[in-house]
Amino acid sequence: MNAIKRLLPVSLFLYALFVVLLPFQARAKDDVENYGTVIGIDLGTTYSCVAVMKNGKTEILANEQGNRITPSYVAFTDDERLIGDAAKNQIAANPTNTIFDIKRLIGLKFNDRSVQRDIKHLPFKVVDKDGKPVVQVKVKGEDRVFTPEEISGMILGKMKQIAEDYLGKKVTHAVVTVPAYFNDAQRQATKDAGTIAGLNVLRIVNEPTAAAIAYGLDKSDKEHQIIVYDLGGGTFDVSLLSIENGVFEVQATSGDTHLGGEDFDYKIVRQLIKTFKKKHGIDVSDNEKALAKLKREAEKAKRALSSQMSTRIEIDSFVDGIDLSETLTRAKFEELNLDLFKKTLKPVEKVLEDAGLEKKDIDDFVLVGGSTRIPKVQQLLESFFNGKKASKGINPDEAVAYGAAVQAGVLSGEEGVEDIVLLDVNALTLGIETTGGVMTPLIKRNTAIPTKKSQIFSTAVDNQPTVQIKVYEGERAMSKDNNLLGKFELTGIPPAPRGIPQIEVTFALDANGILKVSATDKGTGKSESITITNDKGRLTQDEIDRMVEEAEKFASEDAVLRTKIEARNKLENYAHSIKNQVEGDLAEKLEEEDKETLLDAANDTLEWLEDNFDSATTEEFEEKFEALSKTAYPITSKLYGGADGSAPVYDDDEDEDDDTDYFDDEL
């Protein structure tokens, strides 16, 4: 029996508040001048957001649709990969190949209860691969599997691209946020996703802590005790922080990694399934396309009910040609979800208890995450805090990315953030199994990080040559009730009576919440260690390298496809523009022969496009454009006094959505 026995504690606790004294000495060791611009990314369950700090100002960046938040969706069609708005917009037509809610699977095992619960409601297939959940979809007609890290990497890659488009240069480093209650495996997996996206994740920051930075930047006078209540699309966190003179110190954190707006949507979906079955006798609970439509409309209805008392849910030809038409009131929505709303108050009570504070000690509570717009959520919280109103000074959708960008600015040496110090905590107790299956804590929950703690243990039987170190996280007294992070053995212990050998076990928890454990035989000096990685299913370096290569291949394919689509659109817009103006504004100005020449050329081009819309290459679209412009230009130049009859040169940077760019009657 390779159990180990607790002998006596050794106080080698590196007190985390040391960071306050020398917050920037550590930074000097980092090669900050090589980071370039470091971006802040809020990788959300339903939406993601990216921000950057430049010249002391923090900017939330808009995507190509002009939206400051981007759906955390990835879709595969017969021709292409879509990410963000484009992926979400086609889900009803392509539900089994559109991936969302991937954050609910990342870093977890396939047999995890929450994973099993979630996959029942997901329209795409989730299968078991080596004990991990992976997504199975059709890519260009073939079955492919993707890990949650790969899908998250695609979303992070999209955020990276948005930042690069804004900055006009490559981005290689980022700060990424995670729920405060994410465990070690989920944090490691998120870092791996960043690597797959081509990003070096300098720091993993807890979401409520990042939001607190956004809230507290301008509150530098007296000490503030604040609670950040972060209710997003799929996760829920509460953190209690003290803020004073630029020091953000987390006192306690709690939450639920499987509670958020998606759960509220699902309650609406279930209600609509029930009423539709009652009215029409049709059960759509296994119809993926119908469920995708319901999910889309449920989210819209939920959003509408934050500002109005009732809303209509209308879906034409919902199933078998039958329309769906229902009214949902705010009162009914609140009734459906009241148990979940009330459930969010438990972690609030928990952080107050852990920090040894009372409600009256809280100066402010800050609402983060889109779900905090729900009036009933705000009402319950205000009632809990005896009528105190929530702080409305920050945008709940953008606060986390804003705070992440500020932390990115701290790490990259941006101006204006020199005095900011972030002291976060670990969310779960970390310890090892000792005699009798007892969980012996080394680092208690809500300990400031980074931190290091050592303790002396010994053997449980005479002449024991080996001890097995099993590392757990959790709050239960028995190790079997907690989450096993990893295990390793220390061998070659010289024969000795039980209790004599001294085995020093050291836990080192870094600023990202990632753990390294070592065990040293004090007698021989022999040591073994583990950084908690592959024992709990983290990707190997080979797997990460393969996924990086595939991500680059996808990005290259996306770029080629984007160029092709731009060339196709340019040609189609030009042909339609010629046709419309020949039949409209220029009809009276052109000679019949010229009019016929232009119409024939435009119609021939449009017919060719119809026949070759998907199969033609970028070069063929460009050649057709050149041929059409050579036909059109001599005719139009006669109208406007053109001299040489040569084809015009078109600027690729022009706005190609404007049909009049190529052929305009008002030059």
From Swiss-Prot:
Reaction(s) this enzyme catalyzes, per UniProt: ATP + H2O = ADP + phosphate + H(+)
Compositional bias annotation for Acidic residues: 650-667
Region (Disordered) residue spans: 637-667
A Pfam match: HSP70
Chief location bin: endoplasmic reticulum
EC numbers: 3.6.4.10
Keywords for this protein: ATP-binding, Chaperone, Endoplasmic reticulum, Hydrolase, Nucleotide-binding, Signal, Stress response
Region (Substrate-binding (SBD)): 406-506
PROSITE patterns: HSP70_1, HSP70_2
Protein's UniProt keywords contain ATP-binding: yes
Subcellular location: Endoplasmic reticulum lumen
Gene Ontology, cellular component aspect: cortical endoplasmic reticulum lumen; extracellular region; fungal biofilm matrix; luminal surveillance complex; nuclear membrane; perinuclear endoplasmic reticulum lumen
Broad EC category: hydrolase
Keyword Signal included in the entry's annotation: yes
Region (Nucleotide-binding (NBD)): 132-286
Entry-linked CDD domains: ASKHA_NBD_HSP70_BiP
Activity regulation, free text: The chaperone activity is regulated by ATP-induced allosteric coupling of the nucleotide-binding (NBD) and substrate-binding (SBD) domains. In the ADP-bound and nucleotide-free (apo) states, the two domains have little interaction. In contrast, in the ATP-bound state the two domains are tightly coupled, which results in drastically accelerated kinetics in both binding and release of polypeptide substrates. J domain-containing co-chaperones stimulate the ATPase activity and are required for efficient substrate recognition.
A GO MF term: ATP binding
Motif (Prevents secretion from ER): 664-667
Positions contributing to ATP binding: 44-47, 103, 233-235, 299-306, 370-373
UniProt record similarity statement: Belongs to the heat shock protein 70 family.
Main function: Probably plays a role in facilitating the assembly of multimeric protein complexes inside the ER. Is required for secretory polypeptide translocation. May physically associate with SEC63 protein in the endoplasmic reticulum and this interaction may be regulated by ATP hydrolysis.
Protein known as: Endoplasmic reticulum chaperone BiP
